[in-house]
Design a protein with these regions (language model features):
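A short, active-site helix/loop in glycosyltransferases that binds the activated sugar's phosphate group
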Residues: 98-101, 113-136
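A short acidic, amphipathic alpha-helical/loop segment
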Residues: 73-78, 101, 105-109, 126, ...
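Short beta-strand->alpha-helix junction loop in the catalytic core
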Residues: 138-150
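Short beta-strand elements of ligand-binding domains
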Residues: 64-65, 87-92
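Alpha-helix capping/helix-boundary segments
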Residues: 69, 94, 122-124
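Membrane-proximal helix-turn-helix segments that form the acceptor-binding/catalytic region
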Residues: 50-57, 78-85, 95-116
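N-terminal pre-catalytic "stem/leader" segment of glycosyltransferase-like enzymes
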Residues: 1-70, 74, 82
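Conserved donor-binding/catalytic core segment of Leloir-type glycosyltransferases
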Residues: 153-156
């Protein structure tokens, strides 16, 4: 079975991936509840992580959108202990975003996943340059879903 964690986010990219995962018949293992404050969000995410222990089975696949504040490494470790594979889709790196993580901390955290999906060659190069040995795929896109009509380069 294929799973993802669809925690509501005001971030368009994360919402787009949730929509894409649903269209690909991935199951959302998030716990849906109204969040009134930070404490509620914290406990919802904690419950969601705990739920993965009971839901995941050997051979399953878990897609994690990154950054996944708190518990990212725990999710990967739970999946691995259950015989599951994890794919991490990186939207942004904490090393650049808030400068709370060093490059070494970020690479150590990402080393727990089985596969990484990045936006572009620059991000992939940066990760490799800083020691990331996890296999990676490159989307070469920035926006996932758009109402705009695509155009070919020769039409521009």
């Amino acid at each position: 079975m294929n799973y993802y964690i669809g925690l509501y986010s005001p971030n368009k990219a994360k919402r787009d991936i949730d929509e894409i995962m649903q269209s690909m018949n991935f199951k959302d293992i998030a716990i849906q509840m109204e969040e009134k404050n930070k404490a509620a969000r914290f406990f919802r995410k904690l419950l969601c992580v705990a739920k993965t222990w009971f839901v995941l089975k050997k051979g399953d696949l878990l897609l994690i959108q990154y950054p996944f504040k708190k518990y990212y490494s725990v999710l990967c470790k739970i999946a691995r202990s259950k015989g599951c594979k994890t794919i991490t889709l990186i939207h942004d790196l904490g090393t650049f975003r808030r400068q709370k993580l060093t490059a070494e901390m970020e690479i150590e955290r990402l080393s727990h996943t089985d596969y990484i999906i990045v936006h572009n060659e620059k991000m992939k190069g940066w990760l490799e340059e800083h020691g990331c040995a996890v296999p990676m795929g490159n989307l070469e896109i920035f926006d996932y879903l758009s109402a705009a009509e695509p155009c070919r380069e020769d039409e521009e």
